[in-house]
């Protein structure tokens, strides 16, 4: 999980550490300039986040993407819609460790029992469990419903409207 792990998986087995470092540096330089290429929010997501905010609920992003990429994407695609965003950075272990979630909860001074984790991958299922939070998995993102359920998801929504119903209950 995370960019470094992606680089390790992308190069041939046995690649020297110095080359992995160079590949990581090259990727990072490229990604900083192009992280939003061919990216867009799923239909209905901005409206979902607006509904959540209009209900007086804090909104946040936790991601294994590099923190600079998370900040850029939130600013470009969701200006003013997230109260906090945290990506991969020093001092915070990547998901499925709950570190990023715990940071968000501390930032807002909110108890985990009053929060809902929304995710689209098996790593998100694990992260929510590790954080001791209710989870709303979405079936239109990185993984489909069947895969999510095979990997521990108990409940999967199929639209932003269904997600809002789950969050708003």
Language-model features: where?
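A short, structured active-site edge motif that brings together acidic residues
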Residues: 79-94
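Short acidic capping loops at alpha-helix termini that bridge into adjacent secondary structure
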Residues: 18-19, 80-84, 112-116
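N-terminal helical cap/lid subdomain that shapes the substrate entry/recognition surface
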Residues: 1-47, 54-58, 68-71
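Conserved phosphate-coupling serine/threonine residues in phosphotransfer and NTP-handling enzymes
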Residues: 63-65
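Acidic, Mg2+-coordinating phosphoryl-transfer loop and its flanking beta/alpha structural elements
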Residues: 116-157
């Amino acid at each position: 999980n995370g960019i470094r792990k992606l680089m390790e998986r992308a190069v041939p087995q046995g690649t020297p550490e110095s080359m992995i470092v160079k590949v990581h540096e090259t990727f990072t330089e490229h990604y900083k300039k192009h992280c939003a290429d061919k990216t867009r929010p799923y239909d209905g997501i901005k409206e979902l986040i607006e509904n959540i905010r209009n209900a007086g609920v804090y909104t946040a992003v936790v991601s294994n993407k590099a923190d600079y990429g998370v900040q850029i994407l939130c600013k470009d695609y969701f200006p003013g819609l997230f109260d906090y965003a945290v990506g991969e950075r020093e001092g915070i272990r990547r998901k499925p460790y709950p570190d990023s979630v715990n940071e968000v909860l501390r930032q807002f001074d909110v108890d985990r029992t009053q929060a809902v984790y929304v995710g689209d991958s098996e790593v998100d299922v694990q992260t929510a469990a590790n954080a001791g939070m209710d989870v709303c998995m979405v079936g239109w993102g990185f993984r489909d419903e069947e895969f999510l359920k095979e990997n521990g998801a108990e409940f999967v929504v199929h639209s932003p409207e269904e997600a809002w119903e789950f969050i708003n209950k």
